[in-house]
Amino acid sequence: MEGSMKNYATIREILEKEYRVDDLKPLAKMLCDIVPAKKDDLVRAICSAISGDGLKKAFSLLHPLQQSALAEAVHVHGGDFDGSRFAAKYGSSARKTLSEQQKMHDTPWNLFIWSGALPGDLQGRLAEFVPKPKDDELNVLDELPERILIDDDTGEIRDEDVTEENGLPLQVRHTDRPALNNLLAILRLVDRGKIKVGPKTGHPTGATTTLISGILDGGDWYIPGEEPDDFNNYSEIGPIQAFAWPLLLQGGGLANADGSTLRLTRAGKAALNENLPDAVRSLWKKWEKTTFFDEFSRINAIRGQTAAHRRHMISPATRRPVINAALEECPPGKWVDFDEFSRFMCSQDFRFYVARDLWRLYISEPQYGSLGYAGFGKWSIVEGRYLLAYLFEYMATLGLIDVAYLPPDGVRDDFRGNWGTDGLLYLSRYDGLQYFRINPLGAFVLGKVSAYESVLPEASPGLKVLPNFDIVAMDRTSLSGADVMYLSSIADKTADAVWHISPATLLRAAERGVLPDDILSFLNTRSAEPMPQTVSTLLADTKSRVAKFSYLGAGHLLACSDPMLVKLVASHRSLSSLCVAADDRYLCMLPGKEKAFLKALTELGYVVPHLRDMIER
């Protein structure tokens, strides 16, 4: 029997064109009372044997695992046998067993599946009696183990024989409320022009990631200096949340790069004063479609991504919707093992692809380390690492999923068979992610619930506002980075936990768009005591002063040598609404009225040399 990639409509065609006599005789011995000697007679005998109820007999001769594989092909995959999906549902060992059974030729397996597909004339008949396979289910947890053990041979999590001595403690982070605090803090940094990015890449600079790391509520996932014993220096992992935030703001439409500085868009400015969960939902919808950044580029150990203008890379905008669709199967509030989620995605055909040509991607060296070699670019190494980055660096940073993780060192060894990996402690900085859970913010953003309601306890009021205009932080732990930054924008810091407001600080804040009503609301929500009258009066006075002036736009100042002409133009019926007199020798054209003013002035018999060219440039 010789291999072929042809698809045949009938079993007779396969037997006639693809089987030799030596292949047909074992089948005939299993199915026929008499085994003919000639090929044509063998084909007729086998086809006759599987007519009517004979097909059921042939099916009954299969091993149970083969029967399951055939059931998947008949009822789930439209007549195709998908080995990778079968392995994802039944386990890699099941696929190996299936392959070994096929080589034994002790069942009529090859009668049913040829070149990965059923003959067309058998599919309908088999569907009548082959039992439907059980639906695959995503296994979830209500509670996490405190410690886990990674099997050295399989890389799988073990839940037995775990002790305090050999088990690894999970770091668990609840992300929704900290992420909202972080979003507000970073929006304020952008508003102050403090976020710097590469003008071509949009990636945050080193100074910017350091700045953001210092104000993150709860800190980044891996904080240098807090490493457990026997683990690598966290500083080598690099920033994760601090790197992601500027990219999320840009890809989510809240900020744009103006040279090397991020500036808030109209949506970003609105997010400063609107419902933050709604802003996160809008950002995430835009992020799904953005092509401005590819999360896979953060898998630094896999090189060759930028070759040939990235034409071999598939757009991330095609990957994210597939992952988000798979997340629909995750019940909110339940913990999901990452490997289980990855398995489930393969089993249920939530497939996406990172590259068109894996030969261009490599580890360490292009020739020997290419991911094009069999097994070198498998799902867990390529698509699985993208999935880790997507969940850990972007979804968790934005507060959509809670995470439980370990240091990445040695947690995932699926890449150890690849050439050039001996010196790698991990393939990606995200290898430590073990479990995730869709939290209330994630359920809202992903459309599972209609409103966001955090299950985290409300932070206790942490500020006390004094009559002498001091603001004292009574509980620093209850203040987020966003709160501290806001206080610094409205007051002068006079001690470690004390800020002082004054007319000067309030006017300075108002110039940047932080108005007295916003300040009053901020202080009221973070103070357990009534606002002192002195502070209320100061805020009211500042509000009155701020309301006296408003900006209408930039005008053009014109000098006139004739005071009488200034009066004439300023009072003329066609020009009076387009300008105002400034003293008796100046006129100011109103913003947006320049062209109309120059036209009316020309009709009056006067011009301003060169001004029209300047305006029309």
Question: Could you say what each language-model-derived stretch is?
Answer:
Residues 1-379, 460-480, 485-489, 494, ...:
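Short, amphipathic alpha-helical interface elements at domain boundaries
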Residues 174-190, 283-617:
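Extended alpha-helical interface modules used as scaffolds for assembling large macromolecular complexes
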